[in-house]
């Protein structure tokens, strides 16, 4: 499982699952970035919404397994 690590300008952070494979995760992140560019709001994963004004950065990482 791959997840997006999101940091907001306020300093808070969160993670959201975005894909089973790296390719799927990269596609989901590209979609979110396209949404941000076109309307200022992007959906990262199934339940995380970010805005261009609040977002500092997003990076992909492989989810740690227990």
Describe each model-derived feature in a short phrase.
Residues 14-16, 26, 60:
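Short acidic, gly/pro-rich beta-turn/loop elements at beta-sheet edges
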Residues 12, 22, 64-66:
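Residues that cap or initiate secondary-structure elements
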Residues 12-14, 47:
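Short, mixed charged/polar active-site loops
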């Amino acid at each position: 499982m791959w997840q997006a690590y999101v940091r907001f300008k306020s300093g808070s952070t969160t993670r959201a699952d975005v894909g089973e494979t790296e390719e799927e995760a990269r596609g989901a992140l590209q979609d979110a970035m396209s949404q941000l560019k076109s309307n200022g709001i992007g959906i990262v994963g199934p339940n995380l919404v970010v805005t261009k004004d609040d977002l500092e950065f997003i990076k992909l990482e492989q989810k740690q397994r227990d």
